[in-house]
């Protein structure tokens, strides 16, 4: 692929990432939409560099089968949305800007107050259909990664065969 095509493809990807903010804002109450509108964005290619740093922190094993065993002190698994919501809403973060990544197609990274995310987690997570939602410190010193997988927990199976995982560090 020549450089011109690569540049056009990159610009298209960035425009899609930026337009996701408008789409997200249309689903949120006015006060939440204003907060999203006012925050800065990180788009490709910097977005990929940030996500790669998170993967590197976990030796590129974050979504591997044995991650829960190898890093059990950093990960909790749940069968139900309300369990994840309770867990995340109990999380205490420093009162500062963080990276917010939504695991939906064409999501940029939002630069936003971490406590705002915790306070609004329930509604925000619902708006992205309980998809992945990552809260990451700018220096990668702490983070909360909410992920969704197919499967079930033997002790509390979800009939929809969904497992929610919360991976935390530095908190």
Swiss-Prot record:
The lineage of its organism: Bacteria, Bacillati, Bacillota, Bacilli, Bacillales. This is SPbeta prophage-derived uncharacterized protein YokC. It comes from Bacillus subtilis (strain 168).
């Amino acid at each position: 692929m020549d450089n011109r095509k690569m540049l056009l493809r990159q610009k298209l990807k960035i425009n899609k990432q930026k337009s996701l903010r408008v789409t997200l804002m249309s689903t949120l109450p006015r006060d939440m939409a204003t907060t999203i509108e006012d925050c800065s964005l990180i788009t490709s290619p910097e977005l990929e560099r940030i996500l790669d740093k998170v993967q590197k922190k976990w030796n590129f094993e974050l979504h591997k089968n044995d991650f829960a065993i190898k890093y059990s002190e950093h990960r909790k698994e749940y069968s139900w949305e309300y369990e994840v919501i309770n867990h995340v809403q109990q999380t205490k973060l420093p009162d500062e800007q963080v990276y917010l990544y939504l695991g939906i197609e064409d999501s940029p990274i939002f630069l936003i107050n971490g406590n705002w995310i915790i306070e609004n987690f329930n509604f925000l997570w619902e708006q992205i259909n309980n998809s992945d939602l990552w809260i990451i410190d700018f220096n990668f010193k702490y983070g909360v990664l909410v992920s969704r997988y197919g499967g079930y927990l033997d002790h509390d199976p979800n009939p929809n065969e969904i497992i929610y995982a919360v991976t935390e560090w530095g908190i």
